[in-house]
Curated annotation (Swiss-Prot):
The lineage of its organism: Eukaryota, Fungi, Dikarya, Ascomycota, Pezizomycotina. The gene is LAP1. Residues 1-19 form the signal peptide. Zn(2+) 1 binds at H185, D204, D270. Its EC number is 3.4.11.-. This is Leucine aminopeptidase 1. It comes from Blastomyces gilchristii (strain SLH14081).
């Protein structure tokens, strides 16, 4: 996600702390460096440049967002040539009778417990050893969630990447191959020294990670979902390397496009836990529905989901080009949407630093995101889309 407007750590303070921190030796380079160690990034449609890795972090420190499209060059992919999947979304909610009792099972305690452990890894930087360890821990929690549910056909798999940390995909088969995707990114980063300094990443995006995990747990408690009677298949994704330029999600959706996978909708949950910025601004607590670079029809339906299943309203906000993993789905022609914790300008200023800790989060607010996620997943699982 974005970089905070203030630089509270300070380079001098960061350097002083280095000796006390564990060694985070990078696993290896990302995708092959075809330009002498540089990477091709896209900051806006058609605005590309070759940069070093340090220049990537410098851009992010300045609040610039981008795709790292080096892999497209290597694989001769041309995403803009892909036809956009045309989907007509429902005009109203049809599953409130089933969803409301499920939503009552969502647990703040579960999210707190999972996030406490998830933020205890020194960093979840995608090229670090602890980034692999955190992904391994997360995958075990997802497998436990499946094993303790009645959904015997549900499964979880690694999606491997060359940089170390893998993405994770959990699948709940339905009656068709039409697929609804719920996503979050599991990696974290400290923008001062990514491979060395602590990056608890509680809000960005530990909050989204545990929010969709809790929605996944409760979704599997539905007898109709567990028995595979939903009209559509539902997948939950936890992406690696979002902070490096949406690398993990691009790899996933590129593979899906090459495999002709029928993705009908994708919702991203990135930063779901910070409400203080909104309240400090004297505004009502709300969730932020992103309106730029998203699918209009899916976004309109999400507004109905928030109104129907959440206890707080939505506000409309923008986050810019390539601002989270939903942009990768859009890039490869799939309808996508993004809901964040607030208006973009009121979102957490602690991210990408060592201060992005669990103490800054509001788990009641995260529960609202979990309700929205569960409601959307269930509604679209049974929708004719």
């Amino acid at each position: 996600m974005k970089f905070p407007s203030f630089l509270s750590l300070g380079i001098a303070a960061s350097t002083t702390a280095l000796a006390a921190l564990p060694d985070q030796k990078p696993i290896g380079d990302t995708i092959a460096d075809v330009h002498l160690g540089k990477f091709l990034i896209e900051l806006a449609p058609g605005d590309t440049r070759w940069v070093t890795e340090e220049e990537k972090w410098g851009l992010k420190r300045d609040g610039r967002k981008f795709f790292d499209i080096t892999a497209e060059v290597e694989q001769n992919l041309f995403p803009r040539a892909f036809a956009k999947t045309a989907v007509t979304f429902p005009t109203d909610l049809h599953r409130t009778v089933e969803v409301m009792p499920l939503a009552a099972q969502l647990s703040k305690d579960n999210m707190f417990s999972h996030l406490t452990t998830f933020t205890s890894f020194h960093t979840r930087y995608y090229k670090s050893e602890t980034g692999i360890q955190s992904a391994t821990w997360l995958m075990k929690q997802i497998q436990k969630t499946i094993s303790s549910s009645p959904a015997s056909n549900a499964r979880v798999e690694k999606f491997e990447h060359p940089w170390g940390q893998f993405s994770i995909i959990a699948t709940v088969p339905g009656q068709s191959n039409k697929t609804v995707v719920i996503g979050a990114h599991q990696d974290s980063i400290n923008m001062f020294l990514p491979s060395i300094l602590a990056a608890p990443g509680a809000d960005d995006d530990g909050s989204g990670t545990v929010t969709i995990l809790e929605a996944f747990r409760v979704l599997l408690q539905s007898e109709a979902i567990a028995q595979g009677n939903a009209t559509n298949t539902v997948e939950f994704h936890w992406y690696s390397a979002e902070e490096g330029g949406l690398l993990g999600s691009q790899a996933v959706f590129s593979k899906y496009k090459q495999d002709n996978k029928d993705i009908r909708a994708m919702l991203q949950q990135d930063m779901t836990g910070y409400s203080k910025g909104t309240l400090d601004a004297g505004e009502l607590e709300s969730v932020g529905v992103i309106t730029d670079f998203v699918d209009e029809g899916l976004t309109e339906f999400i507004k109905k989901v928030v109104n129907g299943y959440c206890d707080i309203p939505f506000v409309l906000t923008e986050c810019g080009y390539a601002c989270s993993d939903h942009a990768s789905a859009s890039r490869f022609g799939y309808p996508s949407a993004f809901v964040i914790e607030s208006k973009f300008e009121h979102s957490s200023q602690h991210i990408h630093t060592g201060q992005d800790t669990i103490e800054t989060l509001d788990f009641n607010h995260m529960l609202q995101h979990a309700k929205m996620t569960l409601g959307l997943a269930y509604e679209l699982a049974f929708a004719d889309i």
